[in-house]
């Protein structure tokens, strides 16, 4: 979000954007790949699902989700980085029912009760709280009744209680928005916006969580 939220580290460009997937694999010692695959399996995607991928990036996650969809399914990715969008189009070229749109996710979106599932992976923490709430409201509006919202991101924890070998890189790599994000009760926040039926799955020693909620 450099142009919109200078303190954020969610939006990347240049060398980092061009080699994003490789860098993430290196930083996590290959762990991210197994986490995202596990998370997508836990989504229990149906062949005809319509999925909205917020902050879709290179399309890596979208391509994994597309493998669970039939020709009658659909995936729409949203991103604002031209470099990421270019990679998405290249990576997902074999899936005609997957598309990427250049659109901010923290502003009103045109979708209303259209999607069965919405997925957001390591993006929500990079916004200030009011923008996060707008994103959640966009998700609620975009989902069909009983539609599912999946947030793969940091769990709630205290930086002070992290082991030193994790605390130092976390504080170096992340931004102030992330430090705020991990202190929030996201189940409570989502419930206040109309979501319920929560389900949680943890990764990386409980520092990462897949939080599922349902529009009721």
Feature names for model-found ranges:
Residues 4-7, 151-193, 197-204:
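C-terminal alpha-helical "lid/dimerization" subdomain adjacent to the S-adenosyl-L-methionine
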Residues 1-44, 60, 167:
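Conserved class I S-adenosyl-L-methionine
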Residues 50, 74, 146-148:
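Short glycine-centered segments of the SAM/dcSAM-binding site in methyltransferase folds
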Residues 52-54, 58-107:
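Class I SAM-dependent methyltransferase SAM/SAH-binding core
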Residues 70, 128, 143-145:
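Helix-to-beta-strand junctions that scaffold the AdoMet/dcAdoMet cofactor pocket
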Residues 133-145:
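A short glycine-rich, Lys/Arg-flanked "PGG" loop and its adjoining helix->strand segment in the class I
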Residues 110-118:
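A short acidic, Gly/Pro-enriched loop at the edge of an enzyme's catalytic core
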Residues 117-130:
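A short SAM/SAH-binding and catalytic strip from SAM-dependent methyltransferases
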